[in-house]
Regions:
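Terminal low-complexity, poorly structured segments
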Residues: 9, 86-89, 175-177
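Secondary-structure boundary elements
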Residues: 1-62, 66
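Hydrophobic/aromatic-rich core segments of domains that either
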Residues: 69-148
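Alpha-helical and coiled-coil interaction segments, frequently adjacent to or embedded
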Residues: 140-184
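Intrinsically disordered, low-complexity, compositionally biased regions/tails
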Residues: 40, 46, 125, 156-157
Length: 184
């Protein structure tokens, strides 16, 4: 079984960039729990978190993940294909609301763009920017716009954290272990 999963990963990593991101967008939005059960958006038990981080191999095998898992697959694709990229962790944490997002920004055809995942409606070339700084500003502004929409008058800039990250995650770590690593 491990050979087939590795073969699948190699096949995915060798796709042309547009086909790779079409594949990424097709991954079902959800997560694998500590018991290796899958939970999909819309399931009754979706919010009963016992999250377990999925490696790129597990993500492909399960065809299920969310931005934390998918960002690692995208970073691996970029590394394997010589694509410059940076990864960012965005978090809003208040007493009443907690939301996170990880996002990979990549330079493809000399333009920076937010890499598509299974939760955003972006395309690799739309929008695109001349510099990483412009792309990062768009990402941060878009996240703040989303938060203001959700929180209305309760949005507080001091509750927002945005940082570049480059840590390595072991398979099957918990949500708390993931957050402890990425927040460092």
């Amino acid at each position: 079984m491990a050979v087939k999963i590795q073969s699948d990963l190699d096949d995915i990593l060798s796709l042309p960039v547009n086909e790779f991101f079409d594949y990424v967008r097709s991954i079902k939005y959800g997560y694998k729990d500590q018991d290796n059960d899958l939970h999909f958006l819309g399931d009754k038990d979706f919010k009963i978190y016992k999250y377990s981080f999925s490696t790129p191999e597990q993500l492909i095998h399960n065809n299920c993940g969310w931005c934390w898992d998918i960002s690692e697959l995208i970073k691996l694709y970029c590394r394997e294909n010589g694509v410059a990229c940076k990864s960012f962790f965005l978090e809003y944490l208040s007493n009443d609301f907690h939301h996170t997002h990880t996002q990979v920004l990549a330079c493809i055809n000399e333009k920076w763009s937010a890499c598509p995942d299974n939760s955003m409606g972006t395309e690799i070339i739309n929008p695109e920017f001349n510099t990483l700084g412009e792309c990062f500003k768009w990402l941060k502004d878009s996240y703040i716009e989303y938060l203001k929409y959700v929180l209305d008058d309760n949005f507080d800039d001091l509750k927002l954290s945005v940082k570049e990250y480059d840590c390595i995650f072991n398979k099957n770590i918990t949500e708390d272990e993931y957050l402890n690593l990425i927040r460092k």
